[in-house]
């Protein structure tokens, strides 16, 4: 099979343990682009956060953002497709989370996210302290994120709840299992919500279609729960060496970890083979 598109998850995959892109990854991506291949990022992050890395990896033109809810052209700074969560589902999710424990609300709106300053300061307590500076640099700081989320006219492709307590996260997850929404566990004690049937796998399929490719011509590289659908949907699923067991099981092959050239290995061994 000749693969034409490779999509990399960011955290734990394209980014190393220091949240930086390895030189080996940059070089391999440049080789892929020079060979006429397409390279994309597939992330739970919003377009604004993903765009911050474009200078580090200039060969990457497309991004599957918000866990598949937005397909974005980085070069043109343009949304190619967006799928939003129904307002009544947003309201139910927030009211349920409110009953289960203390959490930080991250609301994706447009190309960025809305967060409260108090919430950003709480990031370390919720297992997402590594993103605190990123939140400060890229978020729209609002007085009350709940007001933003509960506005019935708002377009919200993704919601994130970062709980102080993982048990509260799990209770919320179970209570919303029947909701008309896709729910995924992420980080230490977080959950993210997208429209039903939307995940990185559907985002990958959408991008492939826009590029005139079949999904069988794609490679997906990831390490975590929110990569499972993408790993299964792609023509070739590649798990990182640091991937969780479920990701290894969902993938077809495994490469080195995110600190030791796994992404470069995926490009050279499978995309450019």
What do the PLM-derived regions correspond to, one by one?
Residues 56-59, 66-67, 75, 177-179, ...:
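Short, structured coil segments at secondary-structure junctions
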Residues 36-40, 59-61, 158, 216-217, ...:
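Short active-site oxyanion
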Residues 19-37, 82-89, 141-145, 197-209, ...:
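Short, acidic loop-to-helix structural element flanking the phosphoryl-transfer center
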Residues 20-128:
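Active-site phosphate-binding/coordination module
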Residues 32, 43, 67, 159, ...:
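Residue-level signal for inorganic ion chemistry
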Residues 1-5, 21-22, 192-273:
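Mg2+-dependent phosphoryl-transfer enzymes with acidic/Ser/Thr/Gly-rich catalytic loops
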